[in-house]
């Protein structure tokens, strides 16, 4: 197999249907924590960053933690729309909105949703911000089953194909 070839088919999105973000997620604003109140620790502190899964430091403050298996979305600054899947409890700054899934989410589904949400967020201007109410109303298009509900199985299998292809490419590169 050639390291540059792609085993992934182009997705036909013509039959995808629109869903308001708030139909799929409860959207909650993060909380301000001043440097003076910040205590060093091991809890991820998620901010307006496009690096390191949004983690800007680690703290021990526990008053405003969000659970694992949620998404964080930067709504402010140059990284508007940047979306990350959080795998452990964390504190989200007030530059970040937290998306609590209204469905059974796993890492593969989160990896599907993150770039879809980022694309919508990228439509907002830097000075405008992606306000909480706008984020709730904004629409993402998703693959659907015959009954019109999101096709989560398709989303999971697509991400699994991407992971498999990436693993195979890494294996090829290791053997060069």
Task: Give a label for each model feature.
Residues 90-96, 127-146:
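A short glycine-rich beta-alpha junction/loop motif
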